[in-house]
């Protein structure tokens, strides 16, 4: 926030007690995230800032006897589109869970709609009672191994650095381009550095030596650590370690053992990708704090990682602490270990009281027009388009890892009839296909997947990272056709079929990524989708839609599928479904 001289004069007058504060919170214990101490003190607020701690009088007072005060929580890396909500609805859920600031990477909508998508996200995030900061997508398209809807170069993104809500460059996923000093990639990095921006990393599967390349290029954090050793490597390299606990990627338990008094201030919490049902039911950063404390992390350390550390990582100098001169974003808690939220304050105003959102603070925000965003375009399909022709029965198969975005590459015998793969629910060998949907080019990439344990039907979605083509997994070609046709009819969405009939769906008309519904209405439809998916045999211990949406992301190990076919992360190339060497 930019302050005028008059505002500074007013805050100084309140701090020096020459003027009363607009609001004083009394009798609470306040967490000092700088020292790690709790102290009973008044919190005086003026012009949306904390003017002072101590003994203060105000025009309005709130008695918080028996309560604790901590800074508003900050999510250091999230893709809003993965929640399937507009920024307006997203902010409502996040505020209820104490998250007053989020740093988002809109590369999902950018891969669909380019700069039109960026404009939508920036405008739709404006005038909300929550800070939504944006990092410019670095890799649109993510790779050359798939078709997406747009391309962004350094010139496209550099103009956005003038926007105060744009912090820097989002996760640099294309490591080969960095390592090979690709001109276009370096132009984006240099432009970001010249504008004083932060550069996020994406170091999935990288060795300790490879991290040197990222650091040399100015990349300063990473959220892809899935093991204790990877976490140590990043901290030793000088990176901020983003500890991710989202809907599919759950790395907290693996990384928590390496956190200690010496390195904790270089660690922050992120969720990356969260689906709506998970967000509504379990929360966001508040959920990570609860779980971390249950696993033995010191509560003060957990709150530092969820607030001050993240603010410092991104250069947000007025956020992350309950201290004089900081923006008055804070939570009043009934219990700090459970993150039991009594009230949420944003800019010194109570925006959530006992779980109820104050809707008046959303009056100034707009439901931003998304009709200019492109609609899906696919060629006319038939069931046989999903068949896989085979010359051998020994095949490369994608094996999902529940609650992870990585996969295993396994090789198994499959049933072949008349030269075509026959799906088997007994062997858990199902068809998966990716249908290009941006320009109607007709590309369909196909493969075999196991781990869904589906006994009948199909599930399909237009959320397919990062190019967001249509992806479908099913027990037969006919089931898959029914599901994809419905996704097309909805202009994008989530679909479950059973006996070739659509049994549940959620329309995502905003770029094929986001619902235009109220978050509670969308949530109810998601519950129905999950229920039918379980009826079809899919286990309930992981989210099949988010899992499916990451089977198309070739920059994550190990075996994936794009609209151009099966993709091997180790060789960074497409491979045949049949195993070429036995």
UniProtKB/Swiss-Prot annotation:
CDD domains xref list: AdeC
Any one Gene Ontology molecular-function term assigned to this protein's record: adenine deaminase activity
The protein's Enzyme Commission number: 3.5.4.2
BP terms from Gene Ontology: adenine catabolic process
Broadest EC class assigned to this enzyme: hydrolase
Catalysed reaction, written as an equation: adenine + H2O + H(+) = hypoxanthine + NH4(+)
Superkingdom per UniProt: Bacteria
Needed co-factor(s): Mn(2+)
A family per Pfam: Amidohydro_1
Annotated keywords: Hydrolase, Manganese
Record-stated family: Belongs to the metallo-dependent hydrolases superfamily. Adenine deaminase family.
Matches recorded under PANTHER family: ADENINE DEAMINASE (PTHR11113:SF2), N-ACETYLGLUCOSAMINE-6-PHOSPHATE DEACETYLASE (PTHR11113)
Xref: NCBIfam families: ade
HAMAP family: Adenine_deamin
Protein name as it appears in the record: Adenine deaminase
């Amino acid at each position: 926030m930019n302050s005028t001289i008059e505002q500074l004069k007013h805050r100084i007058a309140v701090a020096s007690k020459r003027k009363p504060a607009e609001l004083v919170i009394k009798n609470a214990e306040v967490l000092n995230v700088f020292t790690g101490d709790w102290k009973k003190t008044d919190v005086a607020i003026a012009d949306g800032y904390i003017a002072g701690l101590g003994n203060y009088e105000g025009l309005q007072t709130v008695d918080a006897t028996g309560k604790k005060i901590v800074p508003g929580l900050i999510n250091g890396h999230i893709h809003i589109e993965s929640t399937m909500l507009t920024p307006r609805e997203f902010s409502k859920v996040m505020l209820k869970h104490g998250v007053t600031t989020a740093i988002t990477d809109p590369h999902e909508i950018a891969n669909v709609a380019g700069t039109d998508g960026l404009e939508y996200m920036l405008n739709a995030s404006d005038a909300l009672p929550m800070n939504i900061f944006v990092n410019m997508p670095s890799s649109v398209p993510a790779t050359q191994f798939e078709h997406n809807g747009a391309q962004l170069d350094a010139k496209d993104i550099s103009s956005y650095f003038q926007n105060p809500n744009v912090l820097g460059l989002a996760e640099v996923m294309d490591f080969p381009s960095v390592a090979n000093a690709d001109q276009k990639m370096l132009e984006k990095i240099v432009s970001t550095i010249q504008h004083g921006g932060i550069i996020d990393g994406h170091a999935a599967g990288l060795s300790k030596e490879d991290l040197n390349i990222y650091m040399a290029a100015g990349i300063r954090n990473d959220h892809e650590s899935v093991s204790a050793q990877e976490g140590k490597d990043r901290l030793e390299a000088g990176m901020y370690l983003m500890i991710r606990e989202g809907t599919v990627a759950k790395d907290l338990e693996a990384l928590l053992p390496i956190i200690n008094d010496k390195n904790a201030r270089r660690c922050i919490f992120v969720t990356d990708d969260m689906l709506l049902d998970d967000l509504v039911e379990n929360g966001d950063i508040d959920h990570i704090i609860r779980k971390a404390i249950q696993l033995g992390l010191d509560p003060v350390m957990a709150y530092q990682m969820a607030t001050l550390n993240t603010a410092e990582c991104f250069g947000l100098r007025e956020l992350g602490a309950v201290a004089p001169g900081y923006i008055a974003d804070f939570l009043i808690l009934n219990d700090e270990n459970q993150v039991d939220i009594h009230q949420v304050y944003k800019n010194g105003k109570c925006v959530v009281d006992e779980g109820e959102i104050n809707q008046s603070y959303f009056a100034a925000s707009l439901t931003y027009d998304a009709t200019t965003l492109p609609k899906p375009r696919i060629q006319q399909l038939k069931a046989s388009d999903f068949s896989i022709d085979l010359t051998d029965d020994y095949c490369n198969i994608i094996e999902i890892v529940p609650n992870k975005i990585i996969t295993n590459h396994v090789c198994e015998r499959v049933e072949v009839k008349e030269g075509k793969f026959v799906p088997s629910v007994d062997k858990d060998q199902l068809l998966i296909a990716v249908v290009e949907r941006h320009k109607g080019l007709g590309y369909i990439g196909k493969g075999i997947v196991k781990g869904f344990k589906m006994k009948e039907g199909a599930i399909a979605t237009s959320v397919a990272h990062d190019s967001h083509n249509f992806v479908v997994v099913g027990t037969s070609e006919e089931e898959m056709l029914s599901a994809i046709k419905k996704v097309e009819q909805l202009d994008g969405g989530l679909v479950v079929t059973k006996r070739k009939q659509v049994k549940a769906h959620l329309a995502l008309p905003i770029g094929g990524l986001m619902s235009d519904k109220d978050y509670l209405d969308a949530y109810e439809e998601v519950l129905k989708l999950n229920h039918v998916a379980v009826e079809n045999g899919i286990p309930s211990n992981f989210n099949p839609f988010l899992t499916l949406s990451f089977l198309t992301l070739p920059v994550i190990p190990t075996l994936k599928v794009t609209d151009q076919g099966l993709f091997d992360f180790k060789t960074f190339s497409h491979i045949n479904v049949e195993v070429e060497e036995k």
